[in-house]
Amino acid sequence: MIGCDCVVCRSPDPRDNRLRSSIYVQTPECSWVVDTGTDFRTQALRENIRTVDAVIFTHSHTDHIMGFDDLRRFSHVRGSMPVYASVETMHDLERVFQFAFKTLDPFPWYLKPEPHVIDGSFELGGTLITPLPVPHGDSIVNGYLFSRGGEKLVAYLSDCSAVPDEIAREISQVKALIIDALRDKPHPTHLSVKQALEVAARVKPEATYFTHISHELPQAAEARLQASARIGYDGLRLSF
């Protein structure tokens, strides 16, 4: 947090140094990123990301879209960049990044989005991607379920203030639940640690990882969670 001297902001544990929430998915067929926050360029350089074949957006808040233009390098390499988003999020992307979405673009080095409005499940390579609409305060945003060969691998719910029963049933017994857990105290647009654990108890995943964590939740708090969940950190890698 800018200008903050709290315990987490002064922590020597590198896992307490958190950038904006995002995930990079790599499969034998292709790779994609979910959300391009303000820190996307820093994250891509740090993790040595060399290919991005598509981008999927959860919603259009600035902490999830403002690194969009840094996809131009990957777009230039492959000729265009498939963009998957809800109709509302796509509209906001087109408004904020008008220069990129222009039909006639005189600058060949610009990012060239290839818009795909999400209206149901879709596939990237051999992965089935199912949108999971969840409330984020007064808004509805998308989480995603990633499945391969009929197996539910990852449910990604980075921003939510509740998880409806039908969504919990859809992702039941997923291998990994990555879920919003902002802090211990309740928040109007994000889940608290207690609420996230309650969702996990309903979903019964093999493993639970917290994301979108504020500076009010230190990495050291993972000790009190015991085996129920892990606090995610920048650079965490999961393999299936």
Region roles according to the model:
Residues 1-157, 166, 223-239:
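Binuclear metal-dependent hydrolase catalytic cores
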Residues 14, 37, 160, 186-193:
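A conditional alpha-helix N-cap/helix-loop micro-motif detector
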Residues 39, 61, 161, 182, ...:
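Catalytic metal-binding/acid-base residues of hydrolase active sites
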Residues 49, 134, 160, 181, ...:
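Hydrophobic pocket-lining residues within nucleotide cofactor-binding pockets
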Residues 164-240:
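Binuclear metal-ion centers of metallo-dependent hydrolases, dominated by the metallo-beta-lactamase
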